Amino acid sequence: MTHRFPRSRTALAVALMAGFAMSAQARVFRSADVHGDSFPTNMAVKFMGDELSKLTGGKDSIKVFGNSALGSEKDTVDQVRIGAIDMARVNGASFNEIVPESLIPSFPFLFRDVDHFRKAMYGPAGQKILDAFAAKGMIALTFYESGARSIYAKRPVRTPADMKGLKVRVQPSDLMVDEIRAMGGTPTPMPFAEVYTGLKTGLVDAAENNLPSYEETKHFEVAPDYSETQHAMTPEVLVFSKKIWDTLSPQEQAAIRKAAADSVPYYQKLWTAREASAQQAVTKGGANILPAAQVDRAAFVKAMQPLWTKYEKTPQMKQIVDEIEATK
């Protein structure tokens, strides 16, 4: 990601603290998340809050409200846009109907692997996507990687034929709906907090997510077959209310941006460790993981990649996709 900071972090920290020595009253920014306190996203935003406090001499800090305490992801996006809450960590798919550019990281099979994701999304292409949020009332501070999303159900999924007849929970995103339909399933939008009950009661037959989310929510108890389709690498996005942002001093804005950027390496370490522990936990809990090598990736790519053309809504979006593909 292109961060607009001086190269010397120490110099920036000193400059920021000097600016805050004579600044206004202390602020506690409220940040929303649907995950629990021990989930990497929450821990990363808390780390960001600690860094922000250091940079501002204790004047600014962040309080994280997890476990959907401030509402669903859609609810918190709406609240951020109107300034009812200061910030939120939200999965990128929740912005798809608001910020067209946010569709791009959700394109099926766009990223070759995690290394490709990091180089693209923390580079110029990713910054262009983040910049697009401002026109919609949000300052997008950074991405947090979210691993590869895969299908889980009460039976393994090896080919698109195995998806036939499955009602699959999706996020409220036209692209996500079309992805599941292209895979052969029946998409069923549903809030994240309702998925466990939906799977248990048969309201939905399957869902799709990364391993840490699968483990944290205990979805493996009611959908024990996790098939590594790895069809998308939709990132998390950390957004700040532009309405609140515009009331902040340049020093506060710079401190928030720096604290967010500094939280990324911390988050990546947490995420990598959590993926490994989640796989162990769900396997121990009775889940069956079908490895990617046993999934017909070529068949899913053939079925889903035409969606790129449908959702490249502007020449600018196509240019960003081309930049991501060209990233080495």
Curated annotation (Swiss-Prot):
Main location: periplasm
NCBIfam families tied to this protein: dctP (TIGR00787), TRAP_S1 (NF037995)
GO cellular component: outer membrane-bounded periplasmic space
UniProt key word Ligase: no
Native source species: Burkholderia ambifaria (strain ATCC BAA-244 / DSM 16087 / CCUG 44356 / LMG 19182 / AMMD)
Keywords from the named record: Periplasm, Signal, Sugar transport, Transport
Molecular functions (GO terms): carbohydrate binding
Name of this chain's protein: Solute-binding protein Bamb_6123
Function statement: Solute-binding protein that binds D-galacturonate and D-glucuronate (in vitro). Probably part of a tripartite ATP-independent periplasmic (TRAP) transport system that mediates solute transport into the cytoplasm.
CDD domains the UniProt entry points to: PBP2_TRAP_SBP_like_3 (cd13671)
Keyword Signal: yes
